[in-house]
Swiss-Prot record:
One term of GO molecular function: zinc ion binding
Binding partners and assembly: Part of the 30S ribosomal subunit. Contacts proteins S3 and S10.
Family that this chain belongs to: Belongs to the universal ribosomal protein uS14 family. Zinc-binding uS14 subfamily.
Cofactor(s) in the UniProt record: Zn(2+)
Keyword Ribonucleoprotein: yes
Cofactor: binding comment: Binds 1 zinc ion per subunit.
Domain of life of the source: Bacteria
Keywords of the record: Metal-binding, Ribonucleoprotein, Ribosomal protein, RNA-binding, rRNA-binding, Zinc
Alphabetical GO biological process terms: translation
Free-text disruption phenotype from the record: Cannot be disrupted; as the protein decreases in cells 70S ribosome formation decreases rapidly, with concomitant loss of uS2, uS3 and YugI (general stress protein 13) proteins from the 30S subunit.
Binding site for Zn(2+): 24, 27, 40, 43
Protein name: Small ribosomal subunit protein uS14B
Role according to the record: Binds 16S rRNA, required for the assembly of 30S particles and may also be responsible for determining the conformation of the 16S rRNA at the A site.
Length: 61
C-alpha cells in the first residue's frame, strides 16, 4: 500500500506538467500502472481473474 502522504501529494497539481505520474486508483502503487485501466499490474490481474474488468479474460492457446 502506498503511504497516505504520497497519495495526498500526488493529488495536488504539480508546478510543471512533467512532474505528473500515474498511480493505481485502487491501491496507490506508482509503478507498472496500465494507463488504459488506471490500475497496477497486481490489481489488474486480481480483477481480471475475478471477471470484474469487461472485455478481459485469461489467454489460453
Amino acid at each position: 500500500m502506498a503511504k497516505k502522504s504520497m497519495i495526498a501529494k500526488q493529488q495536488r497539481t504539480p508546478k510543471f506538467k512533467v512532474q505528473e505520474y500515474t498511480r493505481c486508483e485502487r491501491c496507490g502503487r506508482p509503478h507498472s500502472v496500465i494507463r488504459k485501466f488506471k490500475l497496477c499490474r497486481i490489481c489488474f490481474r486480481e480483477l481480471a481473474y475475478k471477471g470484474q474488468i469487461p472485455g478481459v479474460k485469461k489467454a489460453s492457446w
